[in-house]
Amino acid sequence: GICNKVAGIISPLIFAALILKANDSELFALIESGALDEATKNAMLNELIQRVIIPYIILGIILLLTGIGIRYSVLPEINTDEQNATDEQDNKHTDKKSILDFPYLILGALAIFFHVGTQVIAIDTIINYANSMGMDLLEAKVFPSYTLGCTMIGYILGIILIPKYISQKNALIGCTLLGLALSFGVVWADFDMTLFGHQANASIFFLNALGFPNALIYAGIWPLSIHGLGKFTKTGSSLLIMGLCGNAILPLVYGHFADQYSLRIGYWVLIPCFIYLVFFAIKGHKINSWR
């Protein structure tokens, strides 16, 4: 997770340095002004699009070579057909017939869906949001890295504090409540502040700060969702992985409201997500029956 977030911090800065130029702010303003004829505007937009092609080709080649390396590397085989004796014992005296008989597992998969969606929204939309609040794009390009930096801090504190000083369940409750509070800050904060050398609306920094509680939520949801599954653990884990589709779906929901109303109103999508996460952290993971 830490290596992943380090890459996430560095990569936007590298791509921005490769793609954005010092005079692009004037170029963007000119394109949005409406002063250009259609042919000139399209030519400028095409030039901007062309900049991303080579970096993505290079990235694709790197991923291809990595995949080939993994394919021919000597890695131990994982025998998924071996049934753990403990799993069998866990289910020996239960009438559970499928994963659908574990309500807390289904609720956990939904929790992961909402959680990963809020992660992507907080990271991927912040540049456009900062720009809509009057910040130059060349200045706003660093904000995804700030969000991921907050996530890194959360990971490190989690390693130090959990479970020695704080239980994973209490950490989950605290992080979901903090995420909810920060989400209200994003949609309600209406004052400027200066942080990290940037003077901007406080809601932008609240969006950055969401990276911190989001760091520990996934690790809290997972064990609470698969405990006691026994022989259904592998299938249950697969269901939780399917919850990662929230990465793709919730940003579209945000985009719908952002297009219909405003970028800031779009962030109201975060509120019900975190309300549900608070519910799961406090109550949902304890529900053992649908009745």
Please describe what each predicted stretch is.
Residues 78-108:
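Juxtamembrane intracellular "pre-TM" segments in multi-pass secondary transporters
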